[in-house]
């Protein structure tokens, strides 16, 4: 993630509008070489008779590494060249994407397709075009969907696809190898007490850790969820009853309050670029993040930053009391709104992006920034060419999701969007609330969405 997050990039990729003489049904055009390391079945694509005069408007999250946008733009331009359908793509800052999605959904106007956040489709399901035809085709062709992709793409406990996960963003531990060794560790411990000791020692040697406890869409929610799950706590139980009022949540809050003492000051104000900047500046030695930090350092012309990349390692977040390392991968989730005049063109655009000639290079060049929702893409060679990418490979092969361990619903989305859990941790860590009072506040807010038991 980079300092360019607040910059809104807009690119209109031209192409002649479809003529009035008639619009063909588009098949599976392969305008780029198909990657040879993506296993695929011979499956006939669904046929979408594209609407006359179709033109699309799309919004998606702003990039944190250049290839994410560069290859998205290349693929979009290729789609226009192949089909004649012009597509306008707007790249929206992470903080603004949810509000803009809400406006589009509530006004019934604006972008045809929103590549939005993980569970937001559950808020707007009645306003979305179903995706079963696309999901079934892609799943059959590319080895099936990872379970977490199915959870985010389908109505809870049904086979109805309301959205299509495009790629998951995960946040494993990112750390400086030499500084962690200086603190007495060869790797990041899974035991929470040992992890606390490591962070304390990093602070003592002048290289503190740093985790966002502010309103950072990805980083803060990811850290707060880890803190809950690693201590055996959860927002709701499997039946969807709010379960925050527990001894496990108290333990999680006390743990983060102690950990906060060893963090660099100011993490309460960090957005999703805060830890990136601090790490690249050499101000912190450990954080949780996507691959963007490593990617920027590795590809910098600055020898100092290149040396930092060599001294950087990734590892799954500490397991603590969880069944396995409690890391999720929140996907960028494609939503096609019913107000679109060109739903078939929109579906064809999404299908085109997910096919191997387009998706393979985009995924590989993003270098772990996004993790694949379709199993065949996990076979691509780039995942094993750099061992430092290992924690990002198969990141969507996880049991953890927003709202774990309950149903994924509009309530789960609202809790995340309103930073209910993040604010609970922040209040205790900064000394503005006791664990018990912070839990009461969080429970009241969560019950506004989930209802009372």
Q: Can you say where each PLM-predicted feature lies in the sequence?
A:
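Conserved C-terminal helix/tail region of periplasmic/extracytoplasmic solute-binding proteins
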Residues: 33-38, 42, 50-51, 86-87, ...
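Extracytoplasmic "Venus flytrap"/periplasmic binding protein-like
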Residues: 74-146, 178-190, 278, 282-286, ...
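N-terminal secretory signal peptides and thylakoid transit peptides that target proteins
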Residues: 1-18
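C-terminal lobe and pocket-closing loops
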Residues: 41-43, 48-50, 119, 292-308, ...
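Glycine-centered hinge/linker elements that transmit conformational signals in sensory
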Residues: 198-205, 239-268, 313, 317
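Hinge/lid segment of periplasmic solute-binding proteins
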Residues: 32-50, 117-172, 196, 309-315
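Extracytoplasmic/periplasmic solute-binding protein
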Residues: 153-166, 171, 196-242, 248, ...
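Short, solvent-exposed loop/beta-turn-alpha elements that line the ligand-binding surface or hinge
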Residues: 46-51, 132-148, 231-252, 299-312, ...
